[in-house]
Design a protein with these regions (language model features):
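Active-site-proximal mixed secondary-structure blocks
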Residues: 1-170
């Protein structure tokens, strides 16, 4: 696969459609270099502090949380529709117990700016370095949002990832 450097807004409509549908694939790497992937359905590409960013939400209970906290980086990968089953699987099992890349037939590929891998089978990749992290405060959440998404606690940490590079399959 050949990759071309593109801007943050390249195929933004595709990124948003996938996020609202089957989800995006968030990759990280643990301190030993083991890659991990999880599905995310919440996020926000944009501009903060005059920099391109991709904001993602990760719960502290997730294996990915530990990886991002340790390395300070992640990649948001935009899958094709044909990866719907992989997105489903990566959103339901933990990388602590499962080799999700292998189980889903996904190929980790070295990126250009971070150690977290790109996913070869995806069409767009946002390589990010954490600029800021904030924990959601349960008591400050809208009551309906709190009831629907945080009944058991485990509020997300919000990561503002500076876009170090956006790569598209050509």
């Amino acid at each position: 696969m050949s990759l071309e450097t593109v801007g943050l807004t390249h195929k933004l409509d595709l990124t948003l459609r996938r996020m609202q549908g089957q989800g995006l694939l968030l990759t990280s790497v643990d301190p030993d270099g083991k890659p991990n992937v999880m599905t995310i359905g919440w996020g926000n590409p944009g501009v903060v502090w005059g920099r391109p960013v991709f904001v993602v939400l990760v719960r502290p209970s997730r294996y990915t949380f530990q990886n991002i906290e340790t390395t300070g980086e992640f990649v948001v990968n935009v899958p094709t529709e044909s990866l719907a089953e992989a997105c489903e699987h990566c959103g339901t099992v933990s990388g602590r117990e499962h080799a999700k890349f292998k189980e889903c037939g996904l190929t980790p590929r070295a990126g250009r700016h971070v150690e977290a891998p790109l996913i070869e089978e995806c069409v767009l990749h946002y390589e990010c370095r954490v600029l800021q992290r904030n924990d959601l405060v349960e008591s400050q959440l809208d009551a309906d949002v709190r009831k629907e998404f945080y009944g058991a606690g485990d509020c997300h940490r919000v990561y503002y990832g500076e876009g170090l590079g956006t790569l598209a399959r050509v």
